[in-house]
Amino acid sequence: MENQPNSNPLRKLYLLLLAIGPGIFAIGYTIGTGSVTSMIVAGSEHGMQLLWGLFLSCLFSWVLMEAYGRYALVTGESALFGFKKHLKFGSAISILIIIGVSFGQWNSLIGILGISANAIFETIVLFIPALEGYEYWGVLITALIIISIMYTMLWHGSYTVFERILVIFVSFMGLSFFLSFFIAIPDASAILNGMIPSIPEVENGEKGEGQLLVAAIVGTTMAAATFLSRPLFIQGKGWTIENMKDQSKDARWAAILIFIISGSIMAVAMGAFYHDGVKVERVLDMVDALEPIAGRFAIAIFFIGTLSAGLSSVFPILMICPLLIADYQDGKLDMKSKQFKTLTGIACLISLIVPVMGANPIKAQLVTQVLNVFVLPLVIFGILVLINRKELMGKYKAGPVLNIGIVLSLIFACFISYNGVLAILEKL
């Protein structure tokens, strides 16, 4: 009987994620409703054709998490503080990054809250049909309740509290999407073919759709906020240079879990939507196609996953602006400060834009994920310079393998940014 609790798969997953540490925030930043939306649109419209983009994004995310984590442990400095201190024009670069990342993440938050509130309300309508027709007020009230609870937790919380809450959300999310994968398993050959790089053609003739979707996948997976925030979360965890192996394992497991969870979502979308030519127009379209296969159970599973993905992203995104500003100022994050509480409060108000305006959260989410790509080359270039400085890194200076990984990440980010710009210009 003593071993029974340890045989519980949910508890095992919880303990595994708790052991990951700062990487849990990387999963929170990366897999939100924006990621879910991008993966479902990719899987439903193009099958597994864009799996290569997800794989490369996760591979390069691992490289960049390793680089930023190593820099933090060796120097004791945070990212933007290091840029300001050691790079020529470092202050200008840092300010540009703060503006770009905060704007992109706040836009993501707008879509995330809209999708999460829609998902909850539309699921409630399934069981209480009398609420149909009250969507605007239902979604708005739901959004207000969600963001109020989150802000209250931020007001009273600490790193350890946030980490444990994120672990719970990510546990539910991971299990939900993994179970959904087995409900609609795609063909193995389609998965293998998806590892061959290609940009899909859109049958209806819309220009730039394929490039825009690739940029959205990369934008949500290789989020600049993930790498910039890593040094401060490592600081919050209390790790030192003695934890170098822990940091490396943390980065590796975070990247692996991001690939498995995101890949499962894409595969489910392919199995449920692709062959029937169903297009995702609203939040519940994501779960409707699973109902004939597994009934209401499928809706419940996927709903829990989508909601957990959204809520796991709200915490880190609310924190990103005060985190980056504190990073730039002195490299320290005080979660009890007036500045932290004020800026997170402003983010909460901004997040209500989609529910108040009654906008389509799916379309808003895809566009905002693309915005996250454009500051990424700056973020990669900065760490490439710093981690190769002998006077800063000593024996932990980047070796050939890490340097190749960072350079390839930079080339990949520039390529995706270029294609994202072209796609947006073609749609104007």
Model region roles, listed by residue range:
Residues 26, 53-86, 97-110, 269:
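Juxtamembrane transmembrane-helix boundary signature
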Residues 9-15, 47, 74-103, 126, ...:
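Transmembrane-helix boundary/entry motifs in multi-pass membrane transporters
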Residues 125-155, 171-178, 334-353, 376-385:
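Transmembrane alpha-helical segments of multi-pass small-molecule transport proteins
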Residues 92-131, 310-329, 360-367, 414:
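Hydrophobic transmembrane alpha-helices that form the core helical bundles
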Residues 171-202, 214-215, 220-231, 382-391, ...:
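Hydrophobic alpha-helical segments and their helix-loop junctions in multi-pass secondary transporters
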Residues 145, 153-184, 371-372, 376, ...:
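Membrane-interface loop-to-helix entry segments
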Residues 2-5, 39-41, 66-90, 118-129, ...:
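Flexible loop linkers connecting adjacent transmembrane helices
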Residues 62-74, 234-235, 256-285:
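Extracellular/periplasmic helix-exit of transmembrane alpha-helices
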